[in-house]
Regions:
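Nucleotide-sugar donor-binding catalytic core of glycosyltransferases
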Residues: 17-87, 91-95, 99-100, 123, ...
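Conserved acidic donor-binding segment of nucleotide-sugar-dependent glycosyltransferases
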Residues: 341-347, 356-361
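Short hydrophobic "strand-cap" motifs at the C-terminus of beta-strands
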Residues: 171, 234-236, 341
Length: 398
């Protein structure tokens, strides 16, 4: 699986590293479903801005993780930045400002009418993006590089980073990739316990870190008291989500569900969800959905198994929605079933409980309010960051 587990006391060089001009943390974020790329393309105002201003404005929109971990780390006294390695327009903007040679830009201006040149361009773009990321790590010389799942890297790249960083961390929240260099990282964090067991069986140091909620969102997005008396499902559907698709299709025949997300084309032709599809929701629009609906339903995907590992649970609970989710291992350590969250074991129970909640909005609101209070108390990114620092043996800087 890779090199042996790093037994160095992680974080020992934190203070001496800072005196050398580097930063403490550099986060390498996933461009989940091209959300950052699409947000950049959709806003011409960003195109003329210098990289730093552009990135700050883009990350402040709460797309995917937004700047939640950056804010939490800086609140703990660390210097922290993040980049999105596969957000091509943003990375190319950084390269322009840093005077990094980028052959993709001038090759893109050449006419390409056949398939082969397109493939060549794609390979070149991948090489250029890898090179830009390496330059960013060299220029920042972070003590910790934290890579998030969904960003493909080779073992040789991670080894190259090590020349300019103290430690490499990985967050993983999707199915395992063949040939991914998991063993090159000092610590892998995951919200799915079964993944942690797989890593530990390979001799890789791994630790449990659940998803979280950015508490700043409720200062910008209203949590409505009078809510839409329907169910919202926000998420993705794909050919690999057969159980989720069949479950939601059947449930939508019993209770009113509005679907936000991607993959509507994979639903059965006669599915009510096709008629109640509301498009995709990112950033503050996503949180507005959670803050507006009475009930939010969740169904795990295969890799999550029976674990309470979905980001959606914390986002919807943080916005005060009454979350209905399948009974999961470890859920009771996060939320109190029946009081802060509603659980089901099968389709029939799910439908029956949702019908009860829709007929008794006061009960649903009471559960949502308790869930929000629990989330703000125990499940913010600040709390997750403190847990991470404990794993690393790092204290906040004075």
């Amino acid at each position: 699986m890779g090199r042996p587990v790093n037994t160095r006391p992680v974080g020992r060089a934190m203070k001496t590293r800072r005196s050398g001009g580097g930063i403490d943390w550099l986060l390498l974020m996933e461009d989940y479903q091209a959300s950052y790329t699409e947000a950049y393309k959709a806003d011409p105002k960003l195109h003329s801005l210098p990289y730093k201003v552009c990135a700050e404005r883009l990350f402040s929109r709460a797309i995917y993780y937004g700047d939640a971990y950056i804010h939490a780390l800086t609140s703990c006294g660390f210097s922290a930045e993040q980049v999105v390695p596969l957000c091509q327009p943003l990375q190319f903007k950084w390269a322009d400002g840093a005077d990094v040679w980028n052959p993709s830009e001038w090759i893109a201006k050449l006419p390409m009418n056949s398939g082969s040149p397109v493939i060549i361009r794609q390979l070149l773009d991948r090489w250029v993006l890898s090179r830009i990321l390496a330059k960013q790590i060299v220029s920042r010389r972070p003590e910790f590089v934290w890579l998030f799942s969904g960003v493909p890297v080779a073992a040789r790249e991670v080894r190259r980073w090590r020349r300019y960083t103290g430690h490499t961390l990985l967050w993983w929240s999707c199915p395992l990739w063949e040939d991914f260099p998991y063993g090159e990282f000092d610590l892998i964090l995951a919200a799915i316990p079964s993944l942690i067991r797989v890593f530990e069986e390979q001799g890789i140091r791994a630790a449990y870190l659940p998803h979280a909620f950015d508490h700043r969102i409720i200062q910008r997005v209203p949590c409505l008291e009078s809510r839409i008396p329907r169910v919202a499902f926000v998420g993705s559907l794909s050919p690999g989500h057969t159980d989720r698709i069949s479950f939601l299709h059947a449930l939508s025949r019993r209770v009113p569900i509005d679907f936000y997300g991607s993959g509507v084309q994979f639903l059965p032709k006669d599915s009510p969800l096709r008629h109640s599809y509301r498009g995709q929701a990112w950033g503050e629009d996503l949180y507005s959905v959670y803050g507006s609906y009475l009930v939010v339903v969740h169904r795990n995907i295969d890799v999550a198994g029976t674990s309470a590992s979905a980001k959606r649970l914390f986002e919807a609970a943080g916005m005060g929605a009454c979350v209905v989710t399948e009974s999961s291992d470890g859920l009771s350590s996060l939320f109190a079933p029946g009081e802060e969250i509603v659980t089901y074991s099968d389709l029939e129970e799910c439908g029956a409980k949702i019908e009860t909640l829709l007929s008794d909005p006061a009960k649903a609101r009471a559960i949502g309010q308790k869930a929000q209070a629990r989330t703000l108390q125990d499940h913010t990114y600040y709390q997750r960051t403190r847990t991470l620092l404990d794993y690393l043996g790092v204290n906040q800087l004075q």
